């Protein structure tokens, strides 16, 4: 049976400067969509590339004393490196300087010229070099380019023109009768209004520079950048050289572009296709811009983010997840390091990473690492399984409509529900009752099965993480995760888990602004002295416990005692007594450092419901801010016993 095809493209990037996070944003979106459609079982072709011609490139190369091709070659190598580091799965990388592309452009230009849709005349107007665009006086904004706001240059030259105006009414009718052609809706409305103002014929050749594709019918001219660049979508799938491949993938399912170039893709490109007698792409989606800390990226502001450095610091999957989760695709999005670290710690480390760690740890502890598929159901199980099925449906609907962060939110709601399911079922209590052995097996299976399905659904977003989840569950990750495998019950009986390293260690920011892995954080000498002082103060307080001053009921009422669920536990490095705990108090998560490391192992603590003082003033212990204190009693031999609340919901007030 022939697979459905899905052809997706990014814009081809202009190699005029260094890489920035915006390049990573658009290509990560496209890769995610491509991976999703592969997971649906479709035959996907994913094209990206570089737009290498034009006056701007020629000027840059001249400034640097190199040829244009030498100038762009180095930048293109960095593009390809970035795509590799981000795990981008493009099928081809098209360069407009390649001979295969020159042939396509020249053959199409000749065809349109011969049918009378191209004519020559002298042209005078205002030219924006960075945008490679001519503008009329009335189109300028305060005398500057209406697209980028930069100064324009007055130019006059002989040029060939393409008859955009001839196809204006036909294009407008097409857009109005095909509501999905331009998305989101705001971009569609902008383009309709633009066309209704009247289209000018388009200058498509230049004589003022020679770094471009020669015009086949007049060797004094080279092809204007946009008429050249847009045809990459044909070259990449074999137009003129591989008819079978071209007919297989055209028309494109999705052109993903930044909002600033929607006009070129929804006016010039479809009119070119109409003139060629070719079908139009099914959709052009204009995503928003990525700003940094609320400001547009610029070298003058010093806020251009290097994506390669970011990947070195946080890892590709964390960057991909943040870009996809944090930003509504059709709107502008804000990048900040604080928001990135918050997402890593809250979503990836606490929610997903902790669910896997707790589940695998309990399967090892209670069942020797073996997953048992036992039928001992409970209404809680039915609710969880129903949510899984509902989530898969919501996820697919959102992804099909390019609502990527909506799909991720639905998926993380399932992850949160699975974490809550642990608290509700209390595996540590079931393990104490031999009569509930079958129930414990069912709970463990359900948690592992949720994680298996989560691994499949997250594979388009965090593709390096999904195989790690499979490995820890004792499964072999497939070469291609498939949505068809998300049906409940696919985890085989008898599977043996393989506990591994945390998926995402928590990230902390030092006082100097450096990021460190929480588990390996080193304490500076000054901080060590502060900790010693804090410990001495605590010891003095404890020694005077018997003679503590009496308090009133009003004093006692100031103490906010709450039930908290311990999410993660790890020893504080270079200490014997301190344990760093991540706890959930209702909907809030916080860190508490407690001196219980000699009395409980991390495994014994994870998943436990304990009582904490929730309104204790924050204090730093070993450089870690602790917000709260666990209640525990001490026996005659000095052993600490925690005040547990196993059957009370997290966040409940203790009175």
Specify the residue positions occupied by each region the protein language model found.
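Intrinsic disorder at enzyme termini
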Residues: 469-555
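Phosphate-backbone binding interfaces of nucleic-acid-interacting proteins
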Residues: 527-655
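Beta-strand segments within the central parallel beta-sheet cores of soluble alpha/beta enzyme folds
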Residues: 283-286, 470-471, 580
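Conserved, charged catalytic cores of large soluble enzymes
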Residues: 1-18, 30-202, 234-239, 243-245, ...
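Structured secondary-structure scaffolds
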Residues: 2-48, 100-104, 130, 148, ...
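Short, glycine/acidic-enriched loop or turn micro-motifs at the edges of active sites
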Residues: 54, 231, 571
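Helix-rich, typically C-terminal accessory recognition domains appended to large enzymatic cores
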Residues: 120, 326, 331, 339-377, ...
């Amino acid at each position: 049976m022939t697979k459905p095809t899905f052809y997706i493209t990014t814009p081809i990037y202009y190699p005029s400067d260094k890489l920035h996070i915006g390049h990573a944003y658009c290509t990560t979106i496209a890769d995610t969509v491509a991976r999703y459609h592969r997971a649906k079982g479709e035959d996907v072709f994913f094209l990206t590339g570089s737009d290498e011609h034009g006056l701007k490139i020629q000027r840059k190369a001249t400034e640097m004393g190199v040829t244009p091709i030498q100038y762009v070659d180095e930048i293109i190598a960095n593009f390809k490196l970035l795509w590799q580091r981000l795990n981008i799965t493009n099928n081809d990388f098209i360069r407009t300087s390649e001979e295969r592309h020159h042939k396509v452009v020249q053959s199409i230009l000749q065809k349109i010229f011969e049918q009378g849709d191209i004519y020559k005349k002298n042209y005078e107007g205002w030219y924006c070099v960075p945008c490679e665009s001519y503008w009329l006086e009335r189109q300028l904004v305060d005398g500057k380019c209406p697209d980028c706001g930069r100064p324009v240059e007055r130019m006059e030259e002989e040029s060939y023109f393409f008859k955009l105006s001839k196809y204006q009414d036909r294009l407008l009718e097409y857009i109005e009768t095909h509501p999905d052609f331009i998305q989101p809706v705001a971009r569609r409305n902008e383009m309709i209004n633009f066309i209704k103002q009247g289209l000018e014929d388009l200058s498509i050749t230049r004589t003022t520079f020679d770094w471009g594709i020669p015009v086949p019918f007049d060797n004094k001219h080279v092809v204007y950048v946009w008429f050249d660049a847009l045809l990459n979508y044909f070259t990449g799938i074999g137009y003129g050289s591989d008819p079978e491949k071209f007919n297989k993938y055209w028309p494109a399912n999705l052109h993903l572009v930044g909002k600033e170039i929607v006009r070129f893709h929804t006016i010039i490109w479809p009119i070119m296709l109409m003139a060629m007698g070719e079908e139009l792409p099914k959709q052009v989606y204009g995503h928003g811009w990525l700003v940094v800390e609320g400001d547009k990226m610029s070298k003058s502001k010093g806020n251009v983010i290097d994506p390669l450095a970011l990947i070195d610091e946080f890892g590709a999957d964390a960057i991909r997840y943040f870009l996809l989760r944090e930003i509504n695709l059709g709107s502008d999005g804000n990048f900040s390091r604080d928001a990135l670290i918050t997402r890593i710690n809250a979503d990836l480390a606490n929610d997903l990473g902790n669910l896997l760690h707790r589940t695998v740890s309990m399967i090892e502890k209670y069942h020797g690492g073996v997953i048992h598929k036992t039928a001992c159901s409970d209404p809680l199980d039915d609710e969880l399984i129903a949510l899984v099925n509902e989530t898969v449906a919501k996820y697919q609907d959102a992804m099909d409509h390019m609502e990527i962060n909506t799909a991720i939110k639905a998926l993380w709601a399932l992850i949160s529900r699975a974490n809550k399911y642990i608290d509700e079922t209390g595996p540590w209590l079931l393990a104490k009752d031999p009569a509930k052995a079958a129930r414990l097996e069912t709970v463990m299976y359900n948690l592992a099965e949720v994680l298996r399905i989560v691994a499949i659904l997250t594979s388009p977003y965090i593709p390096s993480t999904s195989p790690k989840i499979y490995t820890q569950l004792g499964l072999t990750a497939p070469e291609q995760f498939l949505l068809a495998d998300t049906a409940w019950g696919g985890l085989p009986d008898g599977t043996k888990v393989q506990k591994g390293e945390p998926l995402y260690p928590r990230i902390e920011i030092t006082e100097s602004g450096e990021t460190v892995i929480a588990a390996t954080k080193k304490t500076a000498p000054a901080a060590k002295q502060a900790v010693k002082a804090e410990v001495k103060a605590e010891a003095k307080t404890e020694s005077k416990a018997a003679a503590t001053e009496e308090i009133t009921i009003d004093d006692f009422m100031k103490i906010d005692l709450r039930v908290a669920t311990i999410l993660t536990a790890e020893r504080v490095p270079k200490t014997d007594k301190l344990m760093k705990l991540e706890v959930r108090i209702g909907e809030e998560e916080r860190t508490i450092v407690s001196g219980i490391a000699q009395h409980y192992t991390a495994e014994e603590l994870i998943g436990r419901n304990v009582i904490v003082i929730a309104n204790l003033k924050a204090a730093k212990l070993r450089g870690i801010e602790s917000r709260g204190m666990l209640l525990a009693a001490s026996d005659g031999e000095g052993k600490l016993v925690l005040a547990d609340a196993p059957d009370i919901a997290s966040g409940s007030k203790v009175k």
